[in-house]
Curated annotation (Swiss-Prot):
GO terms for cellular component: plasma membrane. Probable aspartic protease that is responsible for the proteolytic cleavage of the RNA polymerase sigma E factor (SigE/spoIIGB) to yield the active peptide in the mother cell during sporulation. Responds to a signal from the forespore that is triggered by the extracellular signal protein SpoIIR. This is Sporulation sigma-E factor-processing peptidase. Its EC number is 3.4.23.-. The active site is at residue 183. It is found in: Cell membrane. The keyword Membrane applies. Coiled coil: none annotated. GO terms for biological process: asexual sporulation; proteolysis; sporulation resulting in formation of a cellular spore. InterPro entries: SpoIIGA. It comes from Bacillus subtilis (strain 168). Self-associates. Interacts with SigE. Interacts with SpoIIR. Changing residue 284 to D: Reduced cleavage of SigE. Changing residue 245 to D: Abolishes cleavage of SigE.
């Protein structure tokens, strides 16, 4: 049987990189590209070592564990033991998740690809059956995206609704600070980009927008407000109109602004939620003034930039 070592190594390098990306996504870790490449290279080097006298070492469970430790440390670094074990166990979780999915899909479709000693190869002679290679190359990324979306759904369901949070939004050179309420009833998205929308009371935006522009937005229909705001309004290029439908109402439009950066501060962590829109409400959101914004629960699925200990 011919084995194209360079092709197998390249595939495993890509798969290791995807596993490390999934691990980082699960833990909300920010990983530098050079660390990701380094970790994936070390992981894929097992393929090369299997054809050397070191093969018994890398095939032994202790050898595989040692490689996993090195991969995790190179990719995520080492700060403390708790941090390290979180990374290691999550890496194994991602590996078992993807490996189980591949085995399940293999059993279902009866593909000719197999996993041997942690390395994915094909049973065909030569370069392999095009269908089996298509399964490997297409199936793994598809399973990766499927797993990522399911993890996002689980995170959204586990969010503690009705929790109060602090929100910092950067618009141009100015920063807005508001108190927000995480509300499961807020399921408003931009229908084109699927960007979640948080709602903020317009009074909080007046110091940033200016008095004249705030009056226009407050007293006119969103469609008319866009027409009346002239080029002197510095946030005109960031304004969006989002269609929505309230209970017992016909289709309406909500005027939104695209922030440059948004940070949400919960009791446990600070979350970067840059992919969002700020919907402008002309009515007060809380009668007793306990909060000034309604936070879309999907925004809490962003990357944690700091954990509160």
């Amino acid at each position: 049987m011919k084995i194209y070592l360079d092709v197998i190594w390249l595939l495993n390098f890509c798969f290791d990189a995807l596993l490390l990306l999934l691990t980082a996504f699960i833990l909300k870790r920010h990983v530098k590209k050079r660390r990701l490449v380094g970790g994936a290279f070390i992981g894929s080097s097992i393929v090369l070592l299997m054809f050397t006298p070191f093969s018994p070492i890398v095939e032994h469970p202790a050898g595989k564990l040692a490689f996993s430790v090195v991969i995790v440390v190179v990719t995520f670094g080492f700060k403390r033991f708790r941090f390290f074990f979180q990374n290691l166990f999550s890496f194994y979780f991602a590996t078992f998740l993807m490996g189980g999915g591949i085995i399940g899909a293999h059993s279902l479709l009866q593909s000719n690809s197999i996993v041997q000693n942690g390395v994915m190869i094909t049973n065909q002679t030569g370069f392999g059956d095009p269908i089996s290679w298509l399964f490997i190359v297409g199936g793994f990324p598809a399973l990766w995206f499927f797993s990522k979306r399911r993890i996002e759904d689980i995170e959204t369901k586990n969010i503690q609704y009705e929790e109060r949070v602090s929100v910092q939004a950067d618009l141009g050179s100015q920063t807005l600070h508001v108190r927000g309420l995480i509300d499961s009833g807020n399921q408003l998205y931009d229908p084109l980009t699927k960007t979640p929308v948080m709602i903020i009371y317009i009074d909080k935006l007046e110091p940033i927008f200016g008095t004249a522009e705030t009056m226009i937005i407050r007293n006119t229909d969103p469609l008319e407000a866009i027409e009346q705001l002239d080029d002197s309004f510095r946030f005109l290029d960031k304004m969006r109109l989002i269609p929505y439908r309230g209970v017992g109402q016909q289709n309406q439009f909500l005027l939104c602004v695209k922030p440059d950066h948004v940070t949400i501060m919960t009791k446990e962590e600070m979350i970067s939620a840059d992919k969002c829109l700020i919907g402008i409400s002309t009515t007060k959101l809380s009668a007793d003034g306990e909060f000034d914004a309604i936070i879309h629960p999907k925004m809490l699925s962003g990357k944690a930039v700091k954990h509160v200990s």
